[in-house]
Structures are given as structure tokens and as C-alpha cells.
Amino acid sequence: MFEKIIQLPEKHFLGYGIMMPWENNLEIQFNLWEKAVSSQKIEKLKQLCGSDNVVGIFCYRCDKEKRTFSYHIACENKKNALSTEFEDLKINAGTFAIFKNVCSDFSDRFKSYNELCAEVWKQWLPSSEHISLIELETFGCVEGYASLEIYTPDNPTVVPYQLEILLPIRKK
């Protein structure tokens, strides 16, 4: 559900990700998290960056012709660390709308995620005075603007968890 609108400063992250199709991508996204947890990449990122928080970075870049977008698992780079293993990702300062949802049953994680996204894209955005800066058909595909997904705890393979989506927006 919609929580509030906030201003965020520019943030730098280190992470890794993949390109995935616009449609039917949730299983790919959750599999990426499962592999990150089992391979210890999340712990490695936390140590390298000096951060306890891990985020999903949704739609940092996209390819409109191929109808794909990126999904990264990343940590805020508080140590300004350099890495050949992980990608440097800069999220521009700006206005973000925050949405929250809780998933309490592992078998409902896709449903829970889709319900929150439906609220964002089908209810809140059409009735608000804002436009998403990652809207693929209009403004999207501008590197530096991405949605941040924060899972608490920072592992969506364990339930219950809270999902917080920070969506970059601007006035219409």
C-alpha cells in the first residue's frame, strides 16, 4: 500500500544483475535472489560496501527493442569500494513514492508482489499527480533512474518479509 513520498540524495551501489524480459519475469527475479543467498554473494557485497542493507534495483537499464530490463542485487557503496566482480550503479537524486506490502507465506510471494505492483501501476499512478520515471513505454530506459526494492529481512527467500518499493517519480 502507498506509504509516502520522499526525497532521496544520489546514491551509489555495487551489485550484479541480469537482463530479463518485460513479461513473466518474477520467477527469474526470485531465482536470482535464491542464487545470491546460496552463493554468499550478498555477504560479500555487504562486506565490500560496508553496508548491512541489500536492495533489488529494478529497471536500471533497459532495451526497448528487445523488451528487456535489468534487475540487480546490490548494496549501497558506503566505503566507495572498487570491484571488478561487481558493477557500480548510480541512482540519481530525486523524488520517490514508497509502497509497502507483507508476504507471510512463501507460496504467495508472486501474488504478494503482483498485488503491490497492481496498486502502484493500476491504482496509485493513474489517480495521482505523478508519473513514474521508469515507465517503459514513456519516460523509461534512462540510466540512473530505477526502482529500489527493499526486503526486510534482506532475503525474500525467507518468510515473513516486508517488501518496500521506492519508485522514482515526477509531477505530470
Which residues does each PLM region occupy?
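A solvent-exposed interaction/effector surface
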Residues: 1-172
